[in-house]
Amino acid sequence: PGPPVVSGAGVDACRVRRGSIDIGKDGLDTSGADYTRLISQASQLQGGIWAKKLDVTVGNNDVAANGAVTATEASKGQPLQWGIDVGQLGGMYAGKITLISTDKGVGVNNAGQIFASAGGVSIDANGQLTNSGSLIVSDKEAQQADQAKVTIKATDVTNSGTLSSQGKAQLQTRNLSNSGLIASSNELNLRNQSHLRNSGDISAKRLDIQTGSLDNQQGVISQTGSQKLTLSAGTLSNLNKGVIGALPEGTSSNQGSQTGGQSGQTAQHTPSTAAGGGNVALTTNPSTPVVLADGHIEVSKQLTNDAGQIIANGEVNLSATDGLSNHGQMTLGSLQVRGKQFDNDQGELNLSRLDSETDRFSKRAGQLNDRTTTDIRTQ
């Protein structure tokens, strides 16, 4: 990979400027060691790797003896697409997994399995993260959410597989596209700078989401805890019988149970779920109930819910600062609307409190329940 940096005390660092570490179909079992570090410019896994603690660091880096990246250098020539590439038959199985890709625009691709049993998974990529496989953290012995969590930082995230945590899940990205499952048995903290597109399932006991825009087309965004959920948006459009708030009686969401890997799996054994395939329900310790704060979804610009569901078990309170168009169903505690237009044509509103101040209010063939305390003002 590169020349070592040596002092009188031994090897101080490794200077990586080229080279790839590839794991073939026979895999690599290092579970007998206390920790395993792969340090190279790139790494490809076509088989499994087993470890107690696994660190994979790729890019043109100076890496200290303790595994810390002390310096980086821009790549010369054509950059790689993936710094870490896990194939369909590849996988990582460990107590704790840390993946770092430092080269600009060079990301992480997982089509296989990434499974951590206790210490969680941390991914820091200076490029895109693509997950079409399974990325799961599950530990039935964990007593705190921080002991079994997923932490992801990437420029863009595309998920068509399973991304699931028994503890907290934290995602920091510029754009997020989800057609698979993103789930947490605790809290999902999502900071998305620009556009969030969801046609899959986003589910957590507590939702804490901030994004520039949200397009929920036939997707499900659900808060499974009993606490309240506050939803705020610039402009909101609820289309094609979309549902926001509590589900109508006698119906169910498209979501299944929150999912994850098989609790109790050790790092030395491969989970039985196929890569990118079936899911196993996560369990939490019933003797230590978790009390979480109210959830929050903040969309600074446009929120479009097209035949989708944004739902919670507790009361949902909604505010729109730049107009609202509802052609579906909303079941809310309170609704506050400001802006040019409030359009409830052919829509259904089930509310306790309505506070609307817009230039125009329209409800042709729309429904507003008679138990609502209303304050509607137009200019």
Set out the residue ranges of the language-model regions.
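Extracellular and secretory-pathway beta-repeat/beta-biased strand scaffolds
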Residues: P1-Q379
